[in-house]
Structure formats: structure tokens, C-alpha cells
């Protein structure tokens, strides 16, 4: 429903190749989502960025930008020079073939995926980023790779109050489960 309200209809579900991958794929089929594709990536961060580059057609979008710059480089009129200045500020030219991403990952691996998406110039102005319950990892709030990250969650203030009260009562923090 959320994606529909946001008018997103070409979703990529990103999930790492791990022991539970097949289980997640089965659960996704049971949800009967529409217009989505699954993209499985290596949990190895050294391989991840290359895989995200392929997913986002990064090399082609980079070539598109260079070709477009060449068109305006030889022209002397002000409009062409203005356009060239705009192009010089970009890393790629062209859109990716999806408008929303659901990332089924956590912790540092999630941060690696977000960083790779930012590196490959996937615009959060055009693509909606969603992940799973991330409220237990406060460090994600301070990540600067993506400013608009959506995730289903409990009310964070209530959760923090619960943790504080639990600690005061039992002199221990509650389990994250």
C-alpha cells in the first residue's frame, strides 16, 4: 500500500545471498506483490558495488553523460555553455529502471548497500528507499548516504521510553527480540 500511495510501481527488492535468501524469496511470493524484481547481491562488500553498478546501469549512464558533454563542448553560445556547466556537476546522465528499492538487510551490510547506491548516482529524489525494522540500530539515523530512508517501525520515542523504564526497573536493558 505504501508504494502505491507514493506512486511507485517498479520496485527492486535487494537481498544478500545468505542462508535465509530462499526463505525470504518464498515469503515475498506469498505476499503477492506486483511489479517487483528480486536482485540478490554478494554479502562481500568488495563485490557489492560492482553488482550495484550492473543493476543501475552505471557505466552506460556515465557514458551518456560524457557523450552529452561532448555535444556542448564545441559550442560557444551561452545556452550551450550553461548546459555544459550543469552537466559538469553531474556524475551520470539518465535514470535507473526502477523507482523504489526495498533492502532486506541490516547493520553494516545495509550501510554498504546504501553507500553503493549513492556511489552509483541513484537519486533519492527519484527512487524511494525502504528497508526493514531498523529502529534498533540508532547509527542508521546518522548515516549521510541517504537522507530519506523509510522503514516500518515502532514509535521510536515510545520504544526509547520503554527501554529506559525497563532499565530503571530491572537494571538491565531489554532483549532486542
Model region roles, listed by residue range:
Residues 1-106:
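Extracellular/periplasmic Venus flytrap/periplasmic-binding protein
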Residues 90, 110-115:
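Hydrophilic extracytoplasmic domains
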Residues 34, 50-72, 76-80, 96-100, ...:
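Extracellular/periplasmic periplasmic-binding protein-like sensory domains
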Residues 21-22, 109-111, 136-139:
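Short, well-ordered alpha-helical microsegments
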Amino acid at each position: 500500500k505504501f508504494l502505491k500511495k507514493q506512486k511507485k510501481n517498479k520496485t527492486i527488492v535487494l537481498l544478500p545471498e545468505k542462508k535465509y535468501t530462499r526463505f525470504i524469496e518464498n515469503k515475498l511470493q506469498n505476499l503477492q506483490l506486483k511489479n517487483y524484481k528480486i536482485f540478490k547481491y554478494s554479502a562481500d562488500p568488495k563485490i557489492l558495488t560492482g553488482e550495484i553498478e550492473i543493476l543501475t546501469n552505471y557505466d552506460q549512464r556515465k557514458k551518456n553523460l560524457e557523450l552529452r558533454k561532448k555535444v556542448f563542448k564545441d559550442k560557444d553560445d551561452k545556452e550551450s555553455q550553461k548546459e555544459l556547466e550543469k552537466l559538469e556537476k553531474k556524475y551520470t546522465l539518465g535514470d535507473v529502471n526502477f523507482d523504489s528499492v526495498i533492502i532486506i538487510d541490516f547493520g553494516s551490510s545495509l550501510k554498504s548497500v546504501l553507500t553503493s547506491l549513492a556511489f552509483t548516482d541513484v537519486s533519492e529524489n527519484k527512487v524511494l528507499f525502504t528497508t526493514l525494522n531498523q529502529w534498533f540500530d540508532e547509527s542508521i539515523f546518522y548515516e549521510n548516504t541517504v537522507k530519506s530512508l523509510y522503514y516500518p517501525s515502532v514509535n521510536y520515542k515510545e520504544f526509547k521510553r520503554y527501554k529506559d523504564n525497563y532499565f530503571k526497573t530491572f537494571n538491565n536493558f531489554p532483549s532486542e527480540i
